[in-house]
Each structure stands twice: as structure tokens, then as C-alpha cells.
């Protein structure tokens, strides 16, 4: 009888673990109160957008370490500033369990284009319960931003450093609050704590009025004769579920929301899982090694330009995305905003803890209104998905994500008849819901370099001298048009094909 009980308990535990892998309880990161009149109200605020041309160069970012009257950081003020300065700013941070600092993360995703300097300010605000989240919203967190700004208004701060494009708006404010948040259930900080999230002040309800649909304004103040507005912010807990600084991945996730990116999960349902920072990839290695940006995310940030394939060709020597900005785009000709993006993901840098490695093929049906919607979690829903991965193992469950990269076993192709098939959401030129632009012979060699044949009549990579091609346009691997023939050795793109100049 005891053995039967043990087997029963084991099976129940197994079922529980399986369910947990698929349906980890999660709430959205954007939890203000949606409203229909948002489009009208937003006329006075910068519109939501993903990325922008100001995410390059050296940029200063203000980070506020907010201690509560009833809840302090693990160390005193000096120790806290020292610890978080290390987590945010140390270049090439290699102190276990960290795989790098926050600076390192974004420097790596941008291929060195985005060099962040985080300026830390320590403040003390009211008791934590004043700002607590409920199961429905984060409306109380607006008071945390208000109280933080009230303290900062008494300090000599050069706010112009945080207005990256000179429009009078502080691009975003990061708040790290003391203790745990409410996002870890029984392992969290309890009822009177804050759910880590990102939002805008002007999307918060004005709780001082009796009108349930009266929304507040952002915070505007004067500094050194200039008027600045703080609207976009994110708030993240100091301590993670394990009691350490495993909130690192959550910081990268919420900060990326500030850049305009949505969640790719829907409540408990995940769609790209550990392969993407904006799904469950922020929790890779318990949050210390969040997944790197996908090629699509880097493209939106203007850190990468995918190469569109139109004619039959053979692509070889594709480096890991974490090392070089090389990715390929295959478009639905009859619906240009639907496309596949092919990228090589290897266990390098912040991709070290991905569930697998190989060629990942994203299927993206891009709709800017969904990506930038105030109504969070609209990109992927149970009835419609706009950002997914073709699973090479033909298994969409997140627990099977280790087999999503190509090649998988004997499956090294994505065609109209493969499993999975090269499906579309919108009809192609032949009236079908199939791409009809097959990828064959997908492979990764012992050096981690990927290759594939695009369409059946593929052309091998050419090795040429400078004089072979003269009048055609040359592009580098970032998609930049060269003024003429390249003057140095390397790999270039000519007429949609990779060309090696020796």
C-alpha cells in the first residue's frame, strides 16, 4: 500500500511539474487601466513605439533605489549603492552567478552601439503598503513615482542627461524597490508589496476623483530653467524568489518594455518561452542569464538589418546572433508585414542558458498597433499569434523548447509539406496559406556556423576578387549600402547573395 501511495504521489508531482512548465502563473507587466480614449489623450505625449534612433551612443539612465520606511535594502545606503552600481555598471562583470552587468547585456545586444551609464540615486519613501499592487492592477504604484520624484526634486540633478532626444520628456525612469515583489506567489514579498511592472503615469487612474475613468497627467517639473516630464517608468524588486539578486533578468525585461516592446506571453500561456526575453527568457538560469534579443527585436532597435532573400541561393557561415548582426528575412509577397526571420542561436554570451541551440526561425505577423498597444499581451493570444517560432521537433509545448532549433534529428527543412509546414496567416500570391519559399539542408557545423539552401535551385557562396562585380550594389552584414566595391576582406551581400571578398 505504501508503494502505491509513493507511486501516486510521484505521478501527481510529475503532473504538477508538467503543468508548471506550461502554465507558470504570471500577470502582465503593463497593468494600468486600459481606456478607449487613450488615442485622444496621448496626443500630448510621445506615442508608443518600439525602438528608435536614439538607442545608440553613450546614454545616461537614472536609477532610483527606493527604500521604504518599513522595509530596507539588504545593506545600508552605501553598501546598497555599491552593490547595485556593480550590477548595473560594471563592464565585463564575471562574478558568479552573474554573466554580466545590465550595461553588458544591452551593450552586447546592440553590438556595442548602445553604451549605457546608469546613475544611481538612493531615496527613502513611505511604507511599502502605500504602493502595493492588487490582483487587478498597479494603480498604487503611481504614488511611488510621485514620492520618488518629490525627493529627487530637492537634489542637484542634471535631468538633461536623461532626455535622450531633446523633446522635454525623460525617456524612462528605473526604480528598484527594497525587498521582494509580489510576483513570486508564496516565495514573494506578500500582500503589501509591488508587482514588478512597466507603465506610464498618464495611463494611471486619478484616484483622487470620483470619476472611475478620470486619468491623471504625467509629472512635469522645472530644472535649471528647463521643463521636463516624467511619464514612462518601470519598477523592479531588489530580491528575487531565491533570496538573491535574481531579479536581474526582470530588470532587463521591464527596461525593454520602456523601449516600447510588448510581452509575448498571455497570462499563464507562453509562446516563445525561454527563447525570448519578453516571454520567459528573462528567467533563464534563475534570472541571471536572460535570453538575448531576437533578430527582430534588434532590428526594431535599429541595431541590425536583416537581409531579405528573394532568389534561390545558398547561405553559409552564419555566425551566432550573439556575435554578429546577421539574420535573414523571408517575406510573404502578398502581405509584406508577414515574414520569417532566420537566425543562428548558440550558447554564447547571454544566450548561454537557452534551452537549445541551432537555427531558429521566427514567424512574425507584424502589426504595429498590437506591438504598441496600451492593452498589454495582445501580440500572442490563444486565438491568434503574431510572434512565434517554428518548432523543428514539431512540438509547440514550452517544455519541448529544447528541440525547436533546426536541425532536429532528420528534420533539416522548412517547406510547404514539412512538419511543421511553412504556414502563413495571410494568403500568398497563389492563394494558399503557405509560404512556398522552402529552406533546405539547414545545418550547423562544429564551429557553430549555420547554413541553409533557400529555394530549390540554390547557388553556392561565391569567392571573388574586387574586380569581378563592379556595377552592382554592395552591402555589409548590417545591411548598410557601401559607397562602392569593398576595400577590405570580408563577407558582403550582393544581389541577395553572400559574397566573400578575399
For each of these PLM feature ranges, what is it?
Residues 23-35, 40, 74-112, 117, ...:
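Non-catalytic C-terminal accessory/binding modules of secreted extracellular proteins
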Residues 43-83, 133:
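Fold-level signature of zinc-dependent metallopeptidase catalytic domains
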Residues 12-20:
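Hydrophobic h-region of N-terminal signal peptides that target proteins for export
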Residues 48-52, 97-226:
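Active-site-proximal segments of metallohydrolase catalytic domains
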Residues 454-476:
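Residue-level detector of functionally pivotal "anchor" positions at catalytic/ligand-binding pockets or at interdomain
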Residues 175, 249-263, 342:
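Active-site recognition of the HExxH zinc-binding catalytic motif
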Residues 271-309:
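Post-HExxH zinc-binding segment in Zn-dependent metallohydrolases
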Residues 491-502:
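C-terminal tail/sorting-segment detector
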